[in-house]
A protein has these predicted regions:
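Glycine-rich, phosphate-binding/catalytic loops in enzymes
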Residues: 28-29, 54, 153-154, 182-185
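Short gly/pro/ser/thr-enriched loop/turn and capping motifs at secondary-structure boundaries
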Residues: 46, 171-173
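Aromatic-lined glycan-binding groove of carbohydrate-active enzymes
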Residues: 181-195
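Active-site acidic/histidine proton-transfer and metal-coordination neighborhood
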Residues: 21-24, 61-68, 78-167, 174
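N-terminal pre-domain/capping segments
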Residues: 1-103, 160-164, 190
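Histidine/acidic-residue-rich catalytic or RNA/ligand-binding cores of hydrolases
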Residues: 147-148, 177-184
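Short glycine/serine/threonine-enriched helix-capping/active-site loop
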Residues: 72, 108, 195
Length: 195
C-alpha cells in the first residue's frame, strides 16, 4: 500500500464531492485529485446503500482504488432534550460507519445556541454513547459553537477524554474570521483531533 502523509491522510470532505454522484465516482474523483482519504456523511453512506451496494461492496470499491474513508460525519441536534428518531438513527449510523471504515472520530456540529453548561452536559452524554470513539466538536462561525473559545469551554467542561475539537480552516477563512493562534494557545494539542 501507499504511505499516507505521515500519519494523517489528506482527506477530501464529503461536502466537497457533493451529494449527486455514485459512490465509486466519488472515490475515483478523490483519487484522481490526489487525495488519500475521503470523508463520508451518514447521508452519503446511505446513498451508497441505496445504489444497491452492501458494506462488502463499498469496502471492495475503496480497496480497488486504494482509497480509505478517513472522516465520518455529521451528528447534529445532540443538545435537544427530545432528539428525533432521525437524529438517533443518524448517530447510530455514524457509529457503525466508524467501525466499518476503522475511523476513530466523528465530526459533530451544533446549530442551536445553548449555554456552555448545558452543551457540555449533552456532549458528555454523546461521548458516553460513543464509547471508544472520539467526538470531534466543530466550531463554525454561524453555529451555536461559533468559535474555538466556546468550543474549548464546552469540551473542557464535559470532562470526557473522548471529547475533542476540530479546527476547520475553511469555515474560518470563508467567514473572514481573524487568523489568530492566540485562541488556541491554552488548548492542549491532544484535544484537537483534526485540522
Amino acid at each position: 500500500g501507499r504511505i499516507m502523509s505521515k500519519k494523517n491522510p489528506i482527506t477530501v470532505s464529503s461536502w466537497t464531492l457533493g451529494d449527486q454522484c455514485k459512490f465509486e465516482d466519488r472515490v475515483i474523483a478523490a483519487k484522481e485529485a490526489g487525495y488519500e482519504g475521503i470523508g463520508l456523511r451518514a447521508e452519503t453512506y446511505v446513498d451508497a446503500l441505496n445504489e444497491g451496494l452492501h458494506d462488502e461492496d463499498i469496502l471492495a470499491i475503496l480497496d480497488k482504488h486504494d482509497m480509505k474513508v478517513t472522516e465520518v460525519e455529521y451528528i447534529v441536534q445532540w443538545c435537544e432534550e427530545h432528539r428525533s428518531y432521525e437524529q438517533k438513527y443518524k448517530e447510530q449510523m455514524c457509529f457503525h460507519m466508524c467501525e466499518l471504515f476503522n475511523v476513530g472520530h466523528i465530526n459533530c456540529g451544533l446549530m442551536e445556541d445553548y449555554s456552555v453548561e448545558h452543551t457540555a452536559q449533552k456532549l458528555k452524554e454523546l461521548c458516553q454513547r460513543a464509547g471508544k470513539l472520539v467526538i470531534g466538536v466543530e466550531p463554525m462561525p454561524y453555529s451555536g459553537i461559533p468559535n474555538m473559545e466556546k468550543g474549548w469551554a464546552v469540551v473542557k467542561e464535559s470532562g470526557c477524554d473522548n471529547a475533542k475539537l476540530i479546527m476547520d480552516t475553511w469555515h474560518w477563512v470563508r467567514a473572514n474570521q481573524p487568523i489568530d493562534l492566540e485562541v488556541i494557545k491554552d488548548i492542549p494539542a491532544d484535544k484537537i483531533v483534526s485540522i
